[in-house]
Amino acid sequence: MNKNFQKFLSVLVFVVLTKYSIFALNPTVSFNKGKECQNQEDWYGAIENYTTALQGNPSYGEAYFKLAECFYAIDEYELAITNLYSASKLIKNRPDIINLRGFCYIGLGKLSEANEIFLSVLKDFPNDVDARFGLAELNILNGRISGAEKEYKQALSRQNTNKKALLSLALVSDELGNFVAANNYINQALKYHSGNPEVYYFAAYLAVKQGNLEQGESRIRTAIHLQSDLDKAYKLLADILYKSNRFEECIEICKYRITLDRELSSAWFLRGLASKSLNRYEDAISYWQTGLSIDPNDEIMRSALELLALEYTDIEDPRREEWALFHIEKAKDYEKKFYSVQARYEYQRALRINPLNQEARIAYAELLLSDGFKESYLSQLQFISDQGEATQKILDTIEGYNSLLSNTLSVKWNINPFYLDKKRWNLGLYASEGKTELIHMDGTKIALDFIGDLFVSSNTINANVDSKNVYNFTAAFADARKKGYDYFCILDFTESEREVSGKISMYSGRNGNLVSSWDVYRTGNDRFVSALRYFVTKIESSLPTYGEILNRKNSEILVDIGKKDGLENEDTTEWIVVKKGAIKTADVGIGITFLESDILGYYSVEEIGEEMSSGTISIKGFYDKINVGDYIIPVDTVTPVEESLENKENTEKEVSADSKVREPVLLELLRNIKN
């Protein structure tokens, strides 16, 4: 159970129990204790004390308001609104109470209602800056950053030393690319609030974002000097040290954070990442395992652990059994909900980590069978048998299916489909010159490596990952062209506490033309992996399918594409046979081109298996030049020369269904600024 959720439940139980207690403490004492907890961001302790104060004095309006602030801080917006309603009955016409209701409506996705509240406050209180802050948030949510800048400037014009206005303008100006203005606002904030650690924290953040690590380190150390228990400052310092390749110092800061609070999974993550950079792989694995025991749902940490385990540990390593078990349990949960696609992925992931896990392989085989892939089902059971782990039931099943499938194409042509190399496309994967990462350092690189690992199971794509460097377009294109990639992709990835978003842009490896791009946004559980799987699916489906002739008997040929490649019974697709080595990618868009003179004949599909198909050929012209190794290509994937002059760039956006309001990372930063 989530740690914060446990705390929340305990507080609710406390509220219910103390409601009828006759031993309530002095309301003022409890209220003051609540304020102390709130100032230290101990929201649950504050809620407990404010609730106690209200037991002693049910008409304590300020306690209701403070209670609402705490519920707002832990995203319990409905409870916050309930307490604001109680506060407003006891405290009349106070704008901060009204404004907080507006912010709660933003959290609930009721943007129009929030807008009305902030405008009503400004009508009665034209100089109220919090209402301006609310309107600024609404502008950011609607993608109007310049509109937010205007509201923050209005607030600053009314209070020219307001800390939140100055810091907000610095962040917004930086987002707009106006770095001179951003630094000017930060310098003003440092001038007027020189003793405030939060100001130095954001000053350090902007310095790092603009590439000035030395200045960022100086400022964040000042923040720590001003407030020695400011954990987010220690985290940023550790991030700076990591980015500066000072891994030993980074580890020391992480160790210090852990001594203060062993439940800080972010400290375990970065400690593991720095250890990996020092080639201390066992240490990294140990730290990440500890971090995942604290937060099992940290997908990026789990991905980093699995990627390192695949690279560093032996297949027989007993720890792989434990790492695979996580995915097996998730798969079982999905099966209970009849989510077969998700269950299949989790079993595949378990087998990627531990190929020897019989439970996962049998379950995966059963899913293949339910989808009608009997040959694939049999191959999975034969794998178990080859490892010497087959039970008598499995051996009997293998015998039965060998008899049942005795007339398949693989038997007729004596070719084992398990060993077919159907990789058609060479794809380069690069990380963009990304944004400053606040939660997981190297999150983009880990995402890129994970995408590459997902492509391992692809039938048609050979993915080549370069996650050690960051690239702009020019550098990525030069590298892709040098290595002869058909296409190359550049990943841009961003995460916040609750969301991930990303974009993959795909370009021609021959000429650098943008051929397609995909945007994704996810929130909720499994958002990281879900977003990356979306990218992989889109890239796979965008690339044309074509086959290779495996064998020939007179006019009959065997081709290495089948049901798993999208062929269906009674296939009516027009196929052409093209000379081996004669095809190339289209000049513009995604497609295949070749010379008319390289067309050797035509192909008609007659029998379709899971991995292969067979049919008859007819030759073009007088001479039969069709040989094993030549290509068969669907006519609809061919890009005529005249179409290659048209721009076929495609852009798609995917938003998760459980999303109410998309909240940019910028907004998360702005909300963290205290008034």
Feature map (PLM): residue ranges:
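Structural signature of tandem alpha-helical TPR/SEL1-like repeats
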Residues: 39-52, 73-86, 107-120, 141-154, ...
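Canonical tetratricopeptide repeat
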Residues: 32, 66, 100, 134, ...
